[in-house]
Curated annotation (Swiss-Prot):
EC number of this enzyme: 2.7.7.4
Catalytic activity: sulfate + ATP + H(+) = adenosine 5'-phosphosulfate + diphosphate
Subunit structure: Heterodimer composed of CysD, the smaller subunit, and CysN.
Region (G1): 31-38
Region (G5): 202-204
Family to which the UniProt record says this protein belongs: Belongs to the TRAFAC class translation factor GTPase superfamily. Classic translation factor GTPase family. CysN/NodQ subfamily.
Gene name in the database record: cysN
Protein name: Sulfate adenylyltransferase subunit 1
Organism: Colwellia psychrerythraea (strain 34H / ATCC BAA-681)
Length: 466
């Protein structure tokens, strides 16, 4: 196992113990066709010694049949796992890989570059902390580069690493690197990225991937691996209100009734007064049950079972929140939609809407606009075709309880499912409810809400004018 960690070979239990408390970071690679995404991931795995001997032997064999690097090992084949991908030399599905360093554990999503697979890329981006945008040094910023950057912005990814790849094909030119850097910065000025880094590299030769490049002494910055190890993805939580979506009711016997689910945001303590929606009934948290024993507190991302002091009716798909911090409740809402199916989105047609663990029906009332991903302009449109991104007004069959996606991704996201085929045809991010409640607030209430949001942003108060 010469290409794997020595510790794994010597003591697997010690290795697992060492890694169980490391910070988990999810990142994706995306860009235009043949920018070298799969090769980059293969290089990361190879140079960080995360390839087993049998994997390396298989890749050496496959390189002779499907490789594109001549006599050298084609590291892209480590990720391009589908036979159709290898034969065509492209990535089709989202491929996930796992590796770790001394500091972090990583989950990598290798997403497709071809425009017809943009919906796959959106799926891969939905859970990631960091996006690596690959740009071919020969061609600069392409249409897919713009599209993927825009989707990353819509999905709330704040940390972007722009990897200018194939620097070996432009003679490691500093001038070319600076041109691309300027072009990308100009394009993304309107996107809400809090952190954008740039690194020139050659995934094929390993320059600035894991090890520093001797071919680019003019670049003083960190390698890609160092950036992945050091970018602070633990941004301060601005939305701290409890949102617990019930996945199922756990009733193993007559003496126990618990509500199982994962905290989408906030925290819950034993003794907290909670409200179940949509019923509005109140109770007190009696126990927080886990496989490893009971807890006094559960935080965002934890899967737990809550038991209550009172027997109140709560079913799958309902939501538990704290008293005094209710979500938005509405049937009609505006959402940003990524359309993923060959058949266009049809206003008026009934679809299934899956919001968290709740399944209901609903339809698009109207398509407000769609985005031109090249100019970021909002264009008037009456239809959304495959890979289009637009603003759509929806009407759900039941009242949904949500927060705006920009505030809380856990309760602000939903998927659209075809009722006949059960195929997921779209993904949505809720912007705001469509109602007239904003006009019902007094001037004092509006001023107070604005003051609270400005002076106490950590309270997570929503904008009542939306």
């Amino acid at each position: 196992m010469s290409h794997q960690s020595d510790l794994i070979e010597e003591d697997i239990q010690a290795y697992l113990k060492q890694h169980e408390n490391k910070e988990l970071v999810r990142f994706l690679t995306c860009g235009s066709v043949d920018d070298g995404k799969s090769t980059l991931i293969g290089r990361l795995l190879h140079d960080s010694k995360m390839i087993f001997e049998d994997q390396l032997a298989a890749i050496e064999k496959d390189s002779k049949k499907s490789g594109t690097t001549g006599e050298a090992i084609d590291l892209a084949l480590l990720v391009d796992g589908l036979q159709s991908e290898r034969e065509q030399g492209i990535t089709i599905d989202v491929a996930y890989r796992y590796f770790s360093t001394d500091k972090r554990k990583f989950i990598i999503a290798d997403t497709p570059g071809h425009e017809q697979y943009t919906r796959n890329m959106a799926t891969g981006a939905s859970t990631c902390d960091i996006a690596i945008i690959l740009i071919d040094a020969r061609y600069g910023v392409q249409t897919q580069t713009r599209r993927h950057s825009f989707i990353c912005s819509l999905l709330g990814i704040k940390h972007i690493v722009v990897a200018v790849n194939k620097m070996d094909l432009v003679d490691y030119s500093q001038e070319r690197y600076q041109e691309i850097k300027k072009e990308y910065r100009e394009f993304t000025e309107s996107l809400e990225f809090s952190d954008v880094r740039f690194v020139p590299l050659s995934a094929l030769n390993g320059d600035n991937v894991v090890d520093e490049s001797v071919n680019m002494p003019w670049y003083p910055g960190a390698t890609l691996m160092k950036l992945l190890n050091t970018i602070d993805v633990k941004t301060q939580e601005q939305f701290t209100q409890l949102r617990f979506q019930v996945q199922y009711v756990n009733r193993p016997n007559l003496d126990f009734r618990g509500f199982a689910g994962t905290l989408a945001s906030g925290h819950v303590l034993v003794g907290d007064t909670i409200v179940a929606l949509p019923s509005g009934k109140e109770s007190v948290v009696k126990e927080i049950v886990t496989y490893d024993g009971n807890l006094e507190r559960a935080d965002k991302g934890m899967a737990v079972t809550l038991t209550l002091e009172d027997e109140i009716d709560i079913s799958r798909g309902e939501i538990i929140v704290k008293k005094g911090s209710l979500p938005i409740s509405a049937k009609e809402f505006s959402a940003t939609v990524v359309w993923m199916h060959e058949n266009e989105l049809e206003p008026g047609r009934e679809y299934f809407i899956k919001h968290g663990s709740k399944m209901t029906t609903g339809h698009a009332q109207n398509i407000v606009s769609k985005y031109d991903v090249n100019t970021m302009e909002s264009l008037s449109s009456s239809q959304l075709a495959i890979n289009d991104i637009g603003i759509v007004n929806f009407v759900a069959g039941e009242t949904l309880h949500f927060d705006a996606y920009e505030d809380n991704q856990g309760t602000g996201a939903f998927i659209i499912i075809d009722r006949l085929s059960n195929v997921t045809v779209g993904a949505g991010m809720i912007n705001h409810a469509i109602d007239e409640k904003a006009q019902e607030y007094s001037a004092f209430e509006l001023e107070l809400n604005a003051l609270v949001r400005k002076q106490f942003p950590h309270w997570g108060a929503r904008d009542i004018t939306k």
